[in-house]
């Protein structure tokens, strides 16, 4: 008689659970800043807000948001172009009595709003003025320290208001960096799948599918990404939001952050303020795809078509520094297993960097 036939044990109960925090309202399009008031009303966010912005982004979009939301809410304004622990603490003091937080600007502003709202247990609304990385929609925030950027877990925006006219008017370099950040999903997924096979790391098939599809759409339509075109801004912003949602589904940044991101963080430590986050991720993606045995030339060509850098020289970084970044990558978030943790020697690192320049 089989053990199951005895029926002495109670039946196993399905007890898995998953808490996913996702943006509830997403508005992307031409001249949509005016829709922030009905969105906040729909979400019942409250009657007082702290608007965090930078000097230039306040002029480009912040004042419009302030005027629109000011008709129904009391709005305080906090201006800072930098992000640091000191800035975050100062912004928290300004936000302690408000109902919600609005971030109007680029990555530093959005990340500041994200951390402040998380620490104070408030909701926040993301109003990006550039589409340079997937932080506009994700739960992750990056804070620079003396040893490089530190990635923190916060919560995603409850709403995203992205005006394509404003985003398209930003320097094309920012949009191209955003594209590269999304394209890096390709190798992030490969690393995640490898960690699942080798280390038994849990993996979300839904997050994998969404992340991969988002990267594929950008690669297949790379020739449509053009400077100062709202259609391009629309296309890239939607992809960045999808990438952020994939991370929320997974409950981690795994669907969009693998070895290429570890390389990016290492490069940022060794050559600060040289490359944008998405730019260095794009370069790292080419290397990672080569190591995975994938179509690295195709990735490189897509990045070139978009206008993103594909070599260290393109961003003013010496090849020797890039070699050191490759060797350092495995020390960044060592708990995250990637292809760069498989044992890259100095000789192979030098060859990998030279490979970027190959015909």
From Swiss-Prot:
GO biological process: glycerophospholipid metabolic process; phospholipid biosynthetic process
Residue numbers binding Zn(2+): 181, 261, 277
Note on how the cofactor is bound: Binds 1 zinc ion per subunit.
Sorted UniProt keywords: Cytoplasm, Lipid biosynthesis, Lipid metabolism, Metal-binding, NAD, NADP, Oxidoreductase, Phospholipid biosynthesis, Phospholipid metabolism, Zinc
The keyword Lipid biosynthesis appears for this protein: yes
Any GO molecular function: glycerol-1-phosphate dehydrogenase (NADP+) activity
GO cellular component: a single term: cytoplasm
Listed EC numbers: 1.1.1.261
Chief location of this protein within or outside the cell: cytoplasm
Reaction it catalyzes: sn-glycerol 1-phosphate + NAD(+) = dihydroxyacetone phosphate + NADH + H(+); sn-glycerol 1-phosphate + NADP(+) = dihydroxyacetone phosphate + NADPH + H(+)
Compartment(s) where it occurs, according to its Swiss-Prot or TrEMBL record: Cytoplasm
Binding site residues for NAD(+): 107-111, 129-132, 138
UniProt keyword Cytoplasm, yes or no: yes
Enzyme class (EC, first level): oxidoreductase
Entry cofactors: Zn(2+)
SUPFAM superfamilies, sorted: Dehydroquinate synthase-like
Coiled coil: none
InterPro entries according to UniProt: G1P_dehydrogenase_arc, G1PDH, Glycerol_DH
Binding site for substrate: 134, 181, 265
Family: Belongs to the glycerol-1-phosphate dehydrogenase family.
Protein name: Glycerol-1-phosphate dehydrogenase [NAD(P)+]
Gene: egsA
């Amino acid at each position: 008689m089989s053990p199951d036939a005895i029926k002495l044990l109670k039946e196993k109960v399905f007890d898995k659970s998953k808490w996913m925090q996702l943006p509830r309202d997403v508005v992307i399009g031409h001249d949509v800043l005016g829709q922030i008031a009905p969105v906040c009303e729909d979400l019942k966010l409250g009657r007082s807000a702290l608007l965090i912005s930078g000097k230039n982004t306040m002029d480009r979009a912040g004042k419009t948001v302030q005027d629109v939301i000011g008709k129904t809410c009391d709005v305080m304004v906090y201006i800072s172009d930098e992000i640091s622990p000191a800035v975050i603490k100062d912004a928290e003091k300004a936000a302690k009595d408000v109902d919600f937080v609005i971030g109007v600007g680029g990555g530093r502003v959005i990340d500041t709003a994200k951390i402040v709202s998380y620490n104070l247990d408030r909701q926040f609304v993301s109003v990006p003025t550039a589409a340079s990385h997937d932080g506009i929609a994700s739960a992750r925030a990056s804070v620079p320290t003396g040893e490089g950027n530190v990635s923190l877990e916060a919560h995603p925006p409850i709403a995203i208001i992205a005006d394509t006219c404003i985003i398209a008017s930003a320097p094309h370099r920012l949009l191209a960096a955003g594209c590269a950040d999304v394209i890096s999903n390709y190798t992030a997924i490969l690393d995640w799948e490898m960690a699942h096979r080798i280390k038994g790391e849990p993996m979300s098939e839904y997050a994998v599918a969404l992340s991969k599809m988002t990267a594929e759409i950008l690669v297949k339509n790379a020739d449509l990404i053009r400077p100062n075109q709202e259609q391009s801004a629309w296309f890239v912003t939607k992809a960045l939001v999808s990438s952020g949602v994939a991370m929320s589904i997974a409950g981690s940044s795994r669907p969009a952050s693998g070895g290429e991101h570890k390389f990016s963080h290492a490069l940022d430590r060794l050559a600060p303020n040289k490359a944008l986050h998405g730019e260095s991720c794009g370069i790292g993606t080419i290397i990672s795809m080569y190591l995975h045995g994938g179509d690295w030339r195709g990735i490189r060509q897509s990045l070139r078509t978009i206008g993103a850098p594909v070599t260290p020289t393109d961003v003013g970084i010496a090849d020797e520094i890039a070699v050191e970044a490759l060797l350092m990558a495995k020390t960044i978030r060592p708990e995250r297993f990637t292809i760069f943790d498989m044992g890259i020697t100095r000789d192979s690192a030098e060859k990998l960097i030279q490979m970027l320049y190959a015909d």
